[in-house]
Amino acid sequence: MNIYFWILLWVYIFIPYEIKKEERRIQHIIETHQPEIVTMTTYKAIAEECDSTPNITASGFVITNPKKHRIIAVSHDLKKKWKWGTKVQIVGAGKYDGTYYVRDLMNRRYNKRIDILIGHKDKQTKLKKIKVYSI
């Protein structure tokens, strides 16, 4: 058989199967685990909202495309629970629902709070009682 057949088989059968498997795993976690209930805000990678190096997160991750990276900053109390790179699922935040990675840290004055990195032209948002699951 030729190599293109195997590539097509991989693309059309194996990859969708793996995606569905991951979706089922996340759904199981949502149904069986207690979420962290937080206030969610958004932030932009600009000096006015960060520090003098807005394109480098507290974990050292370099931001090249804010929307693509799916980054959240967490308050210091949540940082004790979630280490750098932890994958989390956000539920109840409308268009912000989905999978994100813990890569940044918020100011110490905040508790039980996450900040979602958005693009420079996006509108700022604040939502309360958002569910966050460690996946």
PLM region spans:
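Hydrophobic membrane-insertion alpha-helices, especially the h-region
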Residues: M1-P16
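Solvent-exposed, well-ordered loop and adjacent helix/strand elements within mature globular domains
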Residues: P16-I135
